[in-house]
A protein has these predicted regions:
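RNA pseudouridine synthases
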Residues: 1-249
């Protein structure tokens, strides 16, 4: 029998999703069969998998060690965990952290998320940092992996927000979607701009050519092909034909 206590960073997710991550090599039908037969229980009661987990919930799996090892993908998860633990998280510049959220300053040249498996991105540095400080155990890593909520281009430096818990991840993702968290950028442009400006226009992207077209106005029949966009900027400093701008997208 295996027993697990739900941690704060695992809470909030559906029981069946938790189990499918815990038993990553098992089929969904196997997981639901074990629930029906009470070979898997939640707080010593029968469960159907739709329950929302809370911190402190007790999960019991009445499975043999061989069966658990077969379906848990433990070797693969442990290998990934140890690889992350070996990463030097010293490059991570933490500017804010609480129980649910961590905010880092991503330097230019660092990927937000990896493009190929061998990349080490900001996401890996965050996971390494949490593992090294003891905030993410091997068992927790199998069922929930903290992740960044926003992305920046490789050559752009700035703040990245990551959810340490499912609640933190969902809350910040929703805040970014609803724009209750505002995004501001700093850039240097050629030319001397001295007034705050609010621009409105329309954007169309050619996916095949990977080109973007921006126009100030469109005809009614073109509405389906364009997205409305708005940009605000204010001059921060002007010098020798260049302007530093604060841009709100």
């Amino acid at each position: 029998m295996k027993q697990f206590t739900i941690s704060p960073n695992e809470s909030g997710q559906r029981f069946d999703k938790y189990l499918k991550k815990l038993l990553s090599n098992a089929s969904g039908s196997f997981v639901y069969k074990m629930l029906r037969k009470k070979n898997i229980t939640l707080n010593d009661h029968k469960a159907d998998g739709t329950e929302k987990l809370n911190a402190g919930d007790l999960v019991k799996l009445f499975l043999s060690d061989e069966t658990f090892e077969k379906f848990s993908g433990e070797d693969e998860a442990n290998s990934e965990y140890m690889k992350l633990k070996s990463i030097d998280s010293g490059r991570l510049q933490v500017v804010y952290e609480d129980d649910d959220v961590i905010i880092m300053n991503k330097p230019s040249g660092m990927l937000s998320q990896k493009a190929v498996p061998e990349d080490i991105s900001a996401n890996e540095y965050i996971l390494s940092y949490l593992i090294r400080k003891g905030s993410l155990s091997e068992d927790q890593f199998k069922t929930f992996k903290p992740s960044i909520c926003n992305r920046l281009d490789r050559n752009t430096s700035g703040l990245l927000i990551a959810g340490k818990t499912l609640n933190g991840l969902q809350t910040m993702a929703e805040a970014l979607k609803k724009r209750t968290v505002q995004k501001y950028y700093r850039c240097i442009v050629k030319g001397e701009l001295r007034e705050n400006t609010h621009l409105k226009g329309y954007l169309s992207k050619d996916e095949q050519k990977n080109k973007v077209k921006v126009v100030s106005r469109i005809r009614p029949e073109e509405k389906a092909d364009y997205l409305p966009i708005e940009t605000e900027y204010r001059p921060v400093a002007v010098s020798n034909g260049y302007t530093e701008l604060e841009v709100h997208l």
